[in-house]
């Protein structure tokens, strides 16, 4: 069984990957998508979105990181994937699940689920171009509007050469609205001969248990559930090891929240750093009452030094 941290554009950047993987329980993580259209991207683009490439493609905690691409041109994607491998990418992941309208309008992400033949062509060309020892994996949703093409899309990915498929158990149109249709993950697993990961609507340990029972797969990718409950992967890992699954207390999370903020201040412009903190805090309010109180204090603050003080004073 493996537990993966989902690639969420605009949320799970290098800073949050660093913090969440240090908490434990995560077997591997994925970069935000690298968007490819018509040209070979420079090394600086990869290093900006995936600075872990300088650290053997691992986070500070030693968690392996995969490089994810998004686009619709098979040859361009393949060329960029091959270049990423020369920079140290250990696994190439392909995004066929992003539901964002701006991405879909430019023929990226979930809109490609309308074209299983193109999915196959993309994976086949990337698989043909990158070194044989580099795995090529893919992430998909159940479809764009309906689910009737889900199995065809999954087959296209597997037959094209994907060695692993993550299934976000909703369509593009469903977005992030509950429920996630975990029973469809089971159907996908039945028609492909590669490992399948379940993804979507796993917020708690009980959600994970239900997902595993309904989907029939052991492997899980956690996204918003892990961001809002940072100890969730550690809890799941404890259960699978036969240990007591202790939740993460606010007191244990506080130093990591402060470290997240300090990294944001160092790496981002002062006008952007507060927004990143507020984004994570807002998600933490789902789990921690203390986060509700702290978020209420910082939500209108743009002064970084004042936020320093509020974080230092928070109980």
UniProtKB/Swiss-Prot annotation:
Kindly state which reaction or reactions the protein catalyses: 5,6-dihydrouridine(16) in tRNA + NADP(+) = uridine(16) in tRNA + NADPH + H(+); 5,6-dihydrouridine(16) in tRNA + NAD(+) = uridine(16) in tRNA + NADH + H(+)
Q: Where is the active site?
A: 98
Query: Which positions bind FMN?
Result: 7-9, 68, 139, 199-201, 223-224
Cofactors needed by this protein, per the record, are:
FMN
Task: Give the site residues for Interacts with tRNA.
Answer: 35, 95, 176, 276, 278, 299
Q: Which UniProt keywords apply?
A: Flavoprotein, FMN, NADP, Oxidoreductase, RNA-binding, tRNA processing, tRNA-binding
Q: Which CDD domains match?
A: DUS_like_FMN
What's the protein called, per UniProt? tRNA-dihydrouridine(16) synthase
